[in-house]
Amino acid sequence: MKIVFSNPFDSTELNEKVDGVVLKIGPFDYTFVRANVDRIEIDFDERNVKINDSLDSTAMLREAIRAFFIIVANELSLNKEFPNGKPAHLDDIAYAHLSWLFMNWFDDSTFEWEYNTSYPDRINVGNVRYIVHNMKEVSYQSTQGIQYGLSDHVLGRIYIIESDRGVVVPDSIKNQTFWHEYVHCLFVQANEDYANDIEYVVNAYATQIALFMKQFETFIDK
């Protein structure tokens, strides 16, 4: 049994196309619909997203994911100046880059997923292939008590800690740790280095990505 991710804009009927879908982002339901717009338009008050109706399903998914990053930043007020005086602003190019990097989740060929595990053991982030290592025991513990892992962007490694001072780390925390480190990889490969200095920005995206992707999960025998 293997986890795969389906594109909600793919029609199950030949010669038909999906006109709209509802996706949960954070606690809110956002409606994504085809419309006569140049690219995408987001209405944060009505919580709907209009996507260019000439796009195919893959391009619609790419635009929906780009909208996801914009919406998360808006709903959580991530684009602002932080207490350390360092501004955080993801411009349109960065959003597009992040969404492109994130699209690999809908392409089976870009990651390897072991049987019955909650995260892959190899994954592409842009042109970099990251290998995930499960560490049996280390003395490291996050100051926030949540993230039990680290990533090496030179060697292309993500390390997930399986036990801490003799205590087994629960699968739910290991899964959240993977997403946390994956978001670090996203930002680094998109050259948005500020997120490496502001952990709660990474935490926010990691949590929202984990919840967002649950909507696309399906299981196949493979």
Where are these regions (language model features)?
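Post-HExxH zinc-binding segment in Zn-dependent metallohydrolases
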Residues: 79-115, 190-222
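Catalytic zinc-binding patch centered on the HExxH motif and its immediate surroundings
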Residues: 16-50, 58, 115-124, 134-159
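Short, basic/low-complexity N-terminal boundary segments at the transition from targeting/disordered tails
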Residues: 1-12, 18-21, 25-28, 128
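Intrinsic disorder/low-complexity detector
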Residues: 5, 69, 98-102, 108-119, ...
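Active-site recognition of the HExxH zinc-binding catalytic motif
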Residues: 61-74, 176-188
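Short pre-active-site segment immediately N-terminal to the catalytic Zn-binding motif
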Residues: 47-64, 155-177, 192
